[in-house]
Amino acid sequence: MKEIIKSEIFKILGRDFVLEKPKDKSLAHYATPLAFSLAKELKKSPVAIANELACKFENSKIFEVSAVNGYLNFKLKGEFLDEISKDALKNGDKFASGKARQDGSTFIEYISANPTGPLHIGHVRGAVYGDTLARIGTHLGYKIFTEYYINDAGNQIDLLGTSISLAARDVLFHENVEYPQKYYRGEYIVDIANEALKKFGKEIFYDEARNLELAEFGKDIVLDIIKKDLAGVGISIQGWASEKALYKELEPTIEKLKRSNQMYEKEGATYIASTTLGDDNDRVVVRNDGRPTYLAGDIIYHNDKFERNYDHYINIWGADHHGYIARLKAAIHFLGYDENRLEIILMQMVSLLKDGKPYKMSKRAGNAVLMSDIVEEIGSDALRFIFISKANTSSLEFDIDELKKEDSSNPIFYINYAHARVNQIFAKAGKSVSDVLDASLENLDDNAKNLLFEALILPEILEDAFASRQLQKVSDYLKSLAASFHKFYNENRVIGSANEESLLKLFAVVALSLRTALSLIGITAKDRM
C-alpha cells in the first residue's frame, strides 16, 4: 500500500520526498515535510508552498490532501482502502507477502549451543529471534537459509564423555568418585548414562580409550533433545553443520589465509594479524602443538558459509561474544571475502522471575533454567511473544506468573482475544468472510477508517522490522491493533447496525492482520477462547 501511495505522490510532485506517518491519525495517515526543504530553493514560506502543492492533488482517487503548517497531509479515501482490503482478504495467508526476490538471499546462523546439554534460558532469546527473522524474511520474498553450527570438536565433548562415565559410576553403580572442577551434571546426564549402559554394557565407563565413543553417543542424544525442544516452540532449522566434520578443511583454509600475507609464525604457533583490521590483539589459529584453536573452527565454518554464496550472512550471538567480532571479521577479510556481508546481531541477557523471585534452577540441567521447563509452564505462544517483545539490544526481564493472567495485562491473551472476538461476531451474525467481501467500506466514519488503515499497514511493519532487525515492532503492532480493535468494538454497535456488513468486512481485515502477524512470530491465532 505504501509503495502505491509513494508512486502516486511522486507522479504528481515529480521529485523525491520523505513520507512520514503522523502519530495523530485524525490529522492524516501520511504526511511529508517537502515544503520545508523547498523553501530555500523557491524563496517562499513552507506554508505557501504546501498550499500550492496541495492543489495538485484535487483529482486524486487515493487520498484527500490538506496543507497544515507547511506539511502536506494525506488522508486515504474509503474507495482506495476498500480496494486494498478486498485484495488482502482474497490473498488470505499470502497477505503482506512479497514476490520472490532475486537479491538479498540471507544465511542465518543461530543458537549453535554446545551439544552437551538441553537448551536453557540463555539460548531461548536467540532461538526465537532467529526463527522469527527467518519467517518474516521468507514471507517478504527473500531466500532464507537457517543453520545450527554444532560445536562438537572441542574439549567440551571430551568432558561430556567423562561426565557420563562419572555419573554412571556415582549414581548407577554407587561408587565413590572424584569429580573434576568442571563437569556436566543433571538428570539428563544420568539418563544418557542409563542409555549407554543398555547399549554398551558396564565396561565402557571404565575404559578411557572409549571416552570419545561415549561422548559421541551422548552428543547424539543431546542433539535429539535440542531438536525436540526446538520443535516444541515451532522452530525447524534447515541445516546442521558439524565443526568436527569441517576440520578436514583445516589445511586448505589455512593455505587460503596465507595468501593474504596476514599470517605469521611466532614461538611455533600460527597467528592472523587481526590487529591490522581493528582487533585488540593478533589471534592464534594453530597452537604450537599443532592443535587448532576455537577461532580456527569458526574460520573454517565461515569459509564454508561464504563459499555457498549468499548475499548476506547473519550470526545471532549472545552479547558476551562482542569481543569476538573483530577477529572473525578480520579472518573473513583475509579469506578474500567482503566482511561487511556478515552481520552480527547480539542478544542481551534475560532474567526470569516467578512471583517476583528468581526462577528456580532445573534438576534436569543441574545449574540452568531449561527452555522446556518454561514452555511447560506458560506454553510456546507466550514464550515466543515475550522473547521478541523487547529490542535485542536491551536486557529482558519478565515474570512467569504475569503471562498466565487472562486479562488485558497479558498481551498475548489480549491479542488472541481480539482474533477470537472477530470469529465470535461473525458467528453471531451468521455470516462468513465471503458473504461480506463485496460490502463497501467507502462510507465508514473516520474512526473505522483509521482502524482499517492500522490493519492494512502490516506489510510496512514487516518490511521495517526485517530491515531494521527490530522484531519487537511486530509485537508492538499486534498490541496496538488489538487495543484499537477492542476500543472500537466497545464503542460501536455492529450486529443489527445499518452498516453491519461493512463493519464485519473491516473486522475480517483486522483478524487477517492479527493472524498473519502472529503466524510470523510463530503463534497460531486462537479462534475461540
Curated annotation (Swiss-Prot):
Its main location: cytoplasm. Its EC number is 6.1.1.19. One of its GO terms (molecular function) is arginine-tRNA ligase activity. One of its GO terms (cellular component) is cytoplasm. One of its GO terms (biological process) is arginyl-tRNA aminoacylation. Keywords: Aminoacyl-tRNA synthetase, ATP-binding, Cytoplasm, Ligase, Nucleotide-binding, Protein biosynthesis. It is found in: Cytoplasm. It catalyses: tRNA(Arg) + L-arginine + ATP = L-arginyl-tRNA(Arg) + AMP + diphosphate. It holds the Pfam family Arg_tRNA_synt_N. A motif ('HIGH' region) lies at residues 113-123. Belongs to the class-I aminoacyl-tRNA synthetase family. PANTHER family: ARGININE--TRNA LIGASE, CYTOPLASMIC, ARGINYL-TRNA SYNTHETASE. Monomer. This is Arginine--tRNA ligase. It comes from Campylobacter curvus (strain 525.92). The gene is argS.
